[in-house]
């Protein structure tokens, strides 16, 4: 004889909950990865059936506490990282694990709400960035490959904007490889260390490395002076406007087959050419290199 459910219930376990929560039933049944606690203990492991003192979803405890109490082993290192971090990602600071992780089931590892690359997940909150990316012709490699976490910590870190490594946001900065540590996780350091090159960069006048000339000095220009970070409307993510204090100054950059030219607002245009070095540039570069030598002393 089939026993009736206790307490006058019409059903038991997840079947009882799914009588109303049909959308969650579909998520669980159609997903590749099922949260272990849902599989082993069902809904009441995390939810009260009648009432709750928490802020939403009749949770037995507040969201962060609920997750950490079960995932103690996995979150031990993470909680230490968060506790010592100078910058905490907003969903983490607010205890919203479910902002990025599906609490019931998911088609992606670690129960992420989107994947396998993290751009769709990040763009679910960062909608302005999503629109800017959509409208841009040239996307930075990590954006193009859908890997925000190549540069950003998803939970917490010690650099503003949740960046993994240091990134200087000023226009001028004394040359130090550490200042560019984020960029040089992908880009070669030699691009700012070699005075001359025929292959490291196309930004050169003959074989004179103009990256070195701009960056490797006491009053060096930072990456941000010329390049957009995420995407841009010009090749190599060259800016149309460069931030300078409270101003934004037009660069007026034009690319040619063998070089380019720019004129920063009030300044006369400057040109460079890889095949036919511009003489005026050579003379000016020599003077600047002398300045660099003096600064080094």
Regions found by a protein language model. Give the residues of each.
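Short sequence/structural segments immediately N-terminal
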Residues: 1-297
């Amino acid at each position: 004889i089939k026993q009736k459910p206790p307490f006058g219930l019409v059903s038991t376990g997840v079947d009882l909950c799914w009588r109303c929560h049909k959308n969650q039933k579909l998520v669980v049944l159609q997903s590749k990865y099922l949260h272990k606690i849902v599989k082993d203990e069902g809904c009441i492991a995390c939810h009260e059936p009648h009432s709750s003192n928490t802020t939403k979803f009749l949770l037995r405890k507040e969201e962060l506490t609920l997750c950490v109490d079960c995932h103690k082993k996995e979150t031990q290192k993470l909680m230490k990282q968060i506790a010592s971090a100078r910058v905490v990602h907003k969903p983490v600071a607010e205890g919203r694990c479910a902002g990025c992780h599906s609490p019931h089931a998911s088609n992606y590892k670690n129960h992420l709400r989107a994947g396998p690359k993290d751009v769709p997940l990040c763009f679910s909150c960062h909608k302005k960035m999503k629109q800017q990316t959509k409208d841009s012709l040239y996307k930075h490699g990590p954006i193009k490959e859908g890997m925000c976490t190549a540069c950003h910590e998803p939970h917490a870190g010690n650099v503003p904007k949740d960046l993994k490594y240091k990134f200087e946001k000023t226009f001028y900065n004394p040359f130090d490889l550490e200042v560019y540590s984020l960029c040089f996780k992908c880009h070669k350091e030699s691009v700012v260390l070699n005075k001359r090159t025929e292959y490291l960069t196309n930004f050169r006048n003959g074989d004179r490395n103009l990256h070195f000339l701009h960056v490797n000095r006491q009053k060096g220009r930072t990456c941000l002076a010329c390049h957009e970070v995420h995407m841009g409307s010009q090749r190599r993510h060259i800016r149309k406007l460069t931030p300078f204090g409270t101003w934004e100054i037009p660069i007026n950059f034009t690319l040619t087959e063998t070089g380019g030219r720019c004129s920063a607002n009030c300044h006369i245009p400057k040109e460079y050419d890889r095949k036919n070095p511009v003489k005026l540039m050579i003379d000016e570069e020599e003077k600047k290199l002398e300045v660099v030598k003096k600064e080094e002393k």
